[in-house]
């Protein structure tokens, strides 16, 4: 497997682009994106577990219930959620994309991100869609990534290539997410494309498995958005032997898909609203993956721990506290905790009790931009990683002014 450039247009047959249509007031901010496959695709997705779901999710689920899609249309600046006419407008967006691209509107994945509860203006999308469709190209992934951003500070895209048999297969993705990120499938949107030939059931299985160990392991602020969507389209243009079962080809594909999702997840976590540090909680020595996952997520979700990391304070008690209320079946007297970064590693807790360590050295470890919290449970061989960021003053400022 090799990481490559190209995002959602790295795979054969995919075009993408973004444009400012007028939903957002700032004309320098693109707010409408499209991704298009020249040929029909197998499609699959996973969505928010929030009981309040954005209208685009309701429409997309219906559209890809048959496992087929050919395009994505997504706006930023308005979530199209909790609106009386939301579903009607989400469907209208599918029609607009279908008309502009010459495809069936039922083959369109629709998504929106932005403020909840505001009426979505449809005219700007209608007016801009033909121009956007004309701009789509094989180098348009970055513009599409920009167009789906809200409070993000960087565009997020990633791609890899692998070999299946004698064929080169590519997988690429773009994502957005900076706040309201605590998925259980960040607002989290991710669109993945691949030229792999793979059946719909196996594609759905793969995207669910990849999400479980990547996107579902992120927490920026503990809020699960109404619009979280992870969708994948596979057009088969790599011409590999179609993957229809859990064979070696499927395992290779899943590993590559997970790598793309992991990279995007880490970019999202590190770009959390107001964040200055990417946090990774690596839990090892668990009796099973479920236990490792539960502990890792509990630690990464702790607001007290996030604040301590911002302050570069090696307050390991907050780690043990989060482990204690995680609800996992563990022996706290076996737990070891360390903090690690590019500077080095400092051990702070052994067998559930504090040990002597240099606070000065610990502060230097925590001064780096990427911090790993190592939690060793000493009860088995399972492990899991969770991703998050520190909690800063700017998080409050950003969300206090979000609608202004």
Model segments located where?
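A structural signal for small-residue-enriched, beta-sheet-centric alpha/beta enzyme cores
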Residues: 1-88, 92, 98-404
């Amino acid at each position: 497997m090799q990481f490559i450039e190209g995002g959602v247009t790295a795979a054969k047959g995919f075009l993408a682009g973004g444009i400012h249509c007028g939903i957002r007031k700032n004309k320098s901010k693109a707010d409408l994106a499209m991704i298009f496959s020249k040929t029909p695709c197998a499609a699959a997705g996973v969505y928010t577990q929030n009981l309040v779901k954005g209208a685009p999710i309701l429409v997309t689920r219906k559209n890809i219930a048959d496992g087929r899609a050919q395009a994505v249309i997504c706006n930023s600046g308005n979530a199209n959620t909790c609106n009386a006419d939301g579903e009607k407008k989400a469907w209208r967006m599918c029609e607009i994309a279908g008309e502009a691209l010459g495809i069936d509107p039922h083959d369109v994945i629709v998504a929106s991100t932005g403020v909840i509860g505001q009426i979505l203006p449809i005219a700007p999308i209608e007016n801009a869609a033909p121009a956007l469709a004309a701009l789509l190209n094989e180098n348009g992934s970055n513009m599409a990534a920009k167009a789906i951003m809200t409070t993000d500070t960087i565009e997020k895209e990633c791609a890899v290539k692998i070999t299946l048999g004698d064929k080169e297969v590519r997988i690429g993705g773009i994502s957005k997410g900076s706040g309201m990120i605590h998925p259980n499938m960040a607002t989290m949107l991710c669109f993945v494309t691949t030229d792999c030939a793979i059946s719909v059931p196996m594609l759905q299985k793969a995207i669910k498995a990849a999400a479980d160990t990547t996107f579902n392991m992120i927490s920026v602020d503990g809020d699960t958005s109404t619009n979280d969507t992870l969708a994948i389209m596979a057009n088969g243009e790599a011409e590999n032997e179609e993957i229809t079962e859990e064979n070696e080809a499927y395992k290779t594909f899943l590993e590559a898909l997970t790598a793309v999702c992991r990279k995007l997840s880490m970019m999202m976590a590190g770009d959390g609203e107001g964040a200055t540090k990417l946090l990774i909680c690596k839990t090892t020595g668990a009796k099973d993956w479920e236990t490792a996952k539960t502990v890792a997520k509990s630690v990464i979700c702790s607001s007290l721990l996030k604040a301590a990391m911002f302050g570069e304070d090696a307050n390991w008690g907050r780690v043990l506290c989060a482990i204690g209320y995680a609800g996992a079946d563990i022996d706290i007297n076996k737990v070891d905790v360390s903090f690690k970064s590019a500077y080095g590693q400092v051990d702070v807790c052994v067998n559930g009790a504090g040990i002597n360590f240099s606070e000065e050295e610990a502060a230097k470890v925590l001064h780096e931009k990427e911090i790993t919290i190592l939690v060793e449970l000493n009860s088995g061989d399972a492990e899991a990683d969770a991703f998050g960021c520190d909690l800063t003053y700017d998080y409050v400022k950003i969300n206090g002014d979000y609608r202004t």
